[in-house]
Amino acid sequence: MSDSRPSGRQPDQLRPVVIQRGFTRHAEGSVLVCFGETRVLCTASVENRVPGFLRGKGEGWVTAEYGMLPRATHTRSDREAARGKQGGRTLEIQRLIGRSLRACVDRNALGERTITLDCDVLQADGGTRTAAITGAYVALVDAVNVLMKRGDIKRNPILGAVAAVSVGVYRGTPVLDLDYAEDSDCDTDMNVVMNDGGGFIELQGTAEGHAFRRDELDALLGLAEKGVRELLDAQQAALSA
């Protein structure tokens, strides 16, 4: 046990990860992903149309929407629909999810159709965007498998797996997969998106307290690589079940 983390986890230890496929019945892909107490419902919906800028080009599109239930956190938040617009954080996160998933898709093989990943946070305890990316990939694969089974596409457009994890410096120690208690009190917070080839798709890093050093950055990236490998294994296990 580590006494430096509120949860007692070791610095390089993920929270328990659960990836449950087929969580709802109507969407082509549906996954409940849990990173500890963070729970996100990820659904993949297929539509036989593309945005205007892609019409007639023979390419598909992958996009994402992200939202939180009003009581996903300690206190209730108004629904963004009631406010009449999405917040900046919501837009930032859903664009991140969309970019991350497009990085693993051959859009020519998808044809002129759109797959939308809807990521709804049921309960938030840190790492909602990384959980959303990790779960949305599995939902995306299930949706693609439906298209293949129906004969709508001839070639699998999935280029490889994608997963994401948070890392940070908490009380002077680089740690993996921050929960809310750590995320709200860390010196550095970073989200790392990677593919199964070890390539980095996106890095989002911020010094919350003091500037981080190069050696701390290297340590954080090393932790992220370890965590993503474990998440990729969890994705594969879920898809093989």
UniProtKB/Swiss-Prot annotation:
Its EC number is 2.7.7.56. Belongs to the RNase PH family. It is an enzyme of class 2 (transferase). Signal peptide: none annotated. GO terms for molecular function: 3'-5'-RNA exonuclease activity; tRNA binding; tRNA nucleotidyltransferase activity. This is Ribonuclease PH. One of its GO terms (biological process) is tRNA processing. PANTHER family: EXOSOME COMPLEX COMPONENT, EXOSOME COMPLEX COMPONENT RRP41. The keyword Ribonucleoprotein does not apply. It comes from the Bacteria. Homohexameric ring arranged as a trimer of dimers. The gene is rph. It catalyses: tRNA(n+1) + phosphate = tRNA(n) + a ribonucleoside 5'-diphosphate. Phosphate binds at R89, G127, T128, R129. Phosphorolytic 3'-5' exoribonuclease that plays an important role in tRNA 3'-end maturation. Removes nucleotide residues following the 3'-CCA terminus of tRNAs; can also add nucleotides to the ends of RNA molecules by using nucleoside diphosphates as substrates, but this may not be physiologically important. Probably plays a role in initiation of 16S rRNA degradation (leading to ribosome degradation) during starvation. Keywords: Nucleotidyltransferase, RNA-binding, rRNA processing, Transferase, tRNA processing, tRNA-binding. The keyword rRNA processing applies.
